[in-house]
């Protein structure tokens, strides 16, 4: 059945223009000709479906925190049509058999596209034996031990060689264990003033530096997870200037908060931690000049009990799928820090290009798109989240703009209750 979407402001080739588009058989088709169904979008903006390359869906193994059903429902509500699932699961996806434990649930329960990562090391331990990259490659978007840094330089070099051979990226959580020293927030003024244990910036950037050298040596495509320090940004900038296949992401909380905003509350605890104002400024500069090409949420839900133990004892991780776009639109687009077009590139276009993912608004694409209501205003209320996780440092923030409709493969998977269309 052909559906014609009219009265829209459509993102195309880096700009918005008034227009219409059509979907048939799950794909975008030419708008001309007779349509079986017409949907008037009321002048709303339409963008390629958002893509989050860093999500913890927790299933299998930790369904008390999140399930694939609840996590992907949250993603759809946030405007995401594709999410990439991190491998810190039980069983960890380190063989085709253990990966299948996850993909079977994805096929049954997911409402958006879920593309899994395979582990780098067996058991996702960050050490020991490497996985069989060739065996996992057909079913994964890349290889990661997110949550752990691969400590051995030799092991990481061999991992990059094997990943390069199968044409997949290494997606690295960069953290030198020997530099952590029991820390859990940034080693800055707040940490020292309140008697906490700090995580130094070098624990991140030192491993980024090592890995970039290995990526250059092996020819591997290399992506840095959740950069948080100014040194990491500069290292990636220099690597890109040299033409290396290096990319990186950061998350909304690192762009909108710093350690000056910390409270004695587990909602403010994540890894890497909120860094200094100077680090945040460097991240914003990296967004502006294109060094940072991706914004990902690092959606990491935990139970209420796990997040209720203060900064020292709470589990690390916050949720982000349902409010990432609306926060960034309110606090980065509206003040003129980035354009809406730039934000769409960071949250939809660039992740697809870097990770070779499908879906979009061009004729022939899988019809994955998000309809945005840029006038919607509300407060972030974790009690209304579809995710099982409730811990966000943005609770109570006033926001503007949100997904009014999310469509995956031509199928509507989310519609905001305020969204009305003429059919």
Feature annotation, model-predicted:
Residues 193-221, 288-289, 293-295, 300-374:
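His/Asp/Glu-enriched, well-ordered alpha-helical/loop segment
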Residues 44-109:
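Metal-associated gating/positioning segment near the N- to mid-region
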Residues 8, 26, 43, 54, ...:
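Divalent metal-coordination and catalytic microenvironments
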Residues 96-113, 162-172, 323, 327:
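Alpha-helix-loop-beta-strand connector modules within alpha/beta enzyme cores
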Residues 1-49, 420:
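Histidine-rich, glycine-flanked metal-binding segment
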Residues 53-66, 115-128, 147, 196-201:
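Active-site mouth loops of central-metabolism enzymes
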Residues 8, 310-313, 363-423:
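C-terminal cap of metal-dependent C-N hydrolases
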Residues 128-295:
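Histidine/acidic residue-rich metal-binding segments in metalloenzymes
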């Amino acid at each position: 059945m052909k559906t014609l979407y009219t009265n829209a402001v459509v993102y195309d080739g880096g700009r918005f223009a008034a227009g219409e588009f059509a979907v048939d058989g799950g794909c975008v088709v030419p708008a001309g000709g007779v349509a079986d169904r017409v949907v008037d979008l009321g002048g709303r903006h339409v963008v390629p479906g958002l893509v989050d390359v860093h999500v913890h869906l927790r299933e299998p193994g930790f369904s008390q925190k999140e399930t694939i059903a609840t996590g992907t429902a949250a993603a759809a509500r946030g405007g995401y049509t594709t999410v990439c699932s991190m491998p810190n699961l039980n069983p960890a996806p380190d063989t085709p058999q253990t990966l299948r434990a996850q993909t079977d649930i994805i096929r049954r329960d997911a409402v958006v596209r879920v593309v899994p990562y395979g582990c780098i090391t067996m058991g996702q331990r960050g050490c020991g034996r490497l996985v069989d990259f060739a065996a996992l490659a057909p079913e994964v978007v890349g290889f990661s031990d997110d949550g752990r840094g691969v400590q051995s330089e030799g092991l990481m070099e061999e991992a990059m060689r094997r990943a390069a051979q199968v044409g997949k990226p290494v997606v690295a959580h960069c953290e030198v264990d020997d530099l952590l020293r029991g820390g859990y927030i940034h080693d800055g003024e707040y940490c020292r003033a309140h008697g906490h244990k700090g995580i130094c910036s070098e624990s991140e950037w030192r491993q980024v530096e090592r890995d970039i050298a290995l990526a250059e040596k092996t020819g591997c495509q290399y992506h840095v997870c959740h950069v948080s320090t100014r040194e990491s940004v500069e290292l990636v900038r220099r690597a890109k200037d040299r033409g290396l296949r290096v990319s990186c992401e950061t998350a909304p909380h690192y762009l909108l908060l710093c350690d000056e905003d910390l409270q004695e509350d587990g909602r403010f605890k994540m890894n890497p931690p909120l860094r200094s104002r100077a680090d945040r400024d460097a991240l914003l500069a990296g967004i502006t000049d294109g060094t940072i090409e991706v914004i990902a949420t690092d959606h990491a839900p935990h139970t209420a009990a796990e997040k209720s133990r203060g900064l020292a004892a709470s589990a690390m991780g916050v949720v982000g799928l349902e409010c990432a776009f609306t926060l960034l639109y309110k606090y980065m687009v509206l003040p003129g820090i980035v354009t809406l077009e730039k934000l769409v590139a960071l949250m939809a276009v660039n992740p697809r290009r870097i990770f070779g993912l499908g879906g979009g608004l061009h004729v022939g694409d899988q019809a994955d798109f998000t309809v945005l209501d840029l006038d919607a205003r509300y407060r972030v209320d974790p009690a209304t989240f579809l995710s099982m996780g409730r811990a966000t440092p943005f609770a109570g923030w006033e926001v503007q703009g949100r997904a009014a409709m999310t469509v995956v493969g031509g199928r509507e998977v989310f519609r905001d209750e305020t969204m009305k269309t003429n059919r």
